């Protein structure tokens, strides 16, 4: 028999009345009623109310002085609660345990975090004492949710015939967009392993090895700055790769997995069909490659309406190659001037010169700084294109296309929030497809890959040889939910001649490609199947399901905003003997 407990703290019911039981757990709450002290005993599973009375002075004195969160084992008799004290919010709310003996397993010191309180604490306190923070229901439930989500994902993948395979953690550096975490080799002096940013090359090699459907709950490591939806250092993804598939095959596999997870673990509605939006349209209509479709506002291009107009600022910008984007603001025409001024100031904080705007007071009256420069036909066209009705306003931004998209997107987001337009209690998924294959690096004055260098260009070798590189699209795709990118994927480039050509456009010689990716190029010489994959982020999925604003809320032991583990004290200095063993020397920054 277990000496610590006969039952868990969520188990006891009326059918256990008059039984002698043993329970163990943490002292969650104490209520001193003079001659009686009530204690809520908590374990992982729930809470049971204990009753201590002063008839046994030794036990009573112990519990009187014992601090909250001390760990105890008790024996006692289960009794029914008085009807007036039944707690229907607890599974055990109809009973209590009259304590006859107690053993203090470990006594707690004064708590830096009140476990039973909803009080907010600083992130430094929470992460330094994460073992206490994890005792709080909200944080604990997030971690339990994460476990359940991963279990359900594994079931889904196995049911579809996928094989779970672990890939190496110590590998070589790869050019996947972020900085690597490097591990010095003790044996091979001057050489380093890299922690994988993703299992990209390994999962492709698995396809070349003849495996048909691979998945892994994969740890990934990227030396990136923190954001609300990105934890520095380490994250996990559902890594997937399949042979003999097209882009549509990937969509058909992963959509049901996402729908199942979000339906099973949330009461929010979910769109059962994921619309497909090209990267071009996402940037044009939403000002972001991560469009939040809960926001009904749609940006429109009104460059041609302002071309050759009397509004000289925009007309001059257009002649210099700039564009004009319009962001509708419903039911704001009668808002005070301060409303419009605040949006102009907001745009300036982003780096824009400002915003123009027109208020459509009624069907025949338009006001604002720009309205007087536009004739009726131009105003009517704005109303038509932007779906404007009487009482609405429109904001305008004029910049080069990339900046115009950014500024318009931020204004769209701000208006959606301020005007309470964001649809609540729903998950709005979409695919973003047709990403550019290359981009121009203005700083380096060179062409580089836009995203994944291992993806297949649309049009294959012919496109690489005959098209402007900046016009070539890739078989790359993202899943976006509520404005958060939760997955990226691609159909891979499995043909060496296409790979060499693509890398040559980005400035790599054949010899450089063979040296950098020797395993992949060697493998592709022995029969590589067409293959593709995707990798939804576990942390972001759980963050959305838990409805928390920060990804660190769903990670058990996260790094802080500065990439520090305050609990374990890392990163930390290494002693000189260890450095010498690794042939390393620390150069102090001046």
From Swiss-Prot:
Organism superkingdom: Bacteria
Membrane-traversing stretches: none
Reaction catalysed by this enzyme: tRNA(Asx) + L-aspartate + ATP = L-aspartyl-tRNA(Asx) + AMP + diphosphate
Disulfide bonds: none
GO biological process: aspartyl-tRNA aminoacylation
The enzyme's E.C. designation: 6.1.1.23
Entry-linked NCBIfam families: aspS_bact, PRK00476.1
Name of this protein: Aspartate--tRNA(Asp/Asn) ligase
Organism the protein comes from: Ehrlichia ruminantium (strain Welgevonden)
Gene: aspS
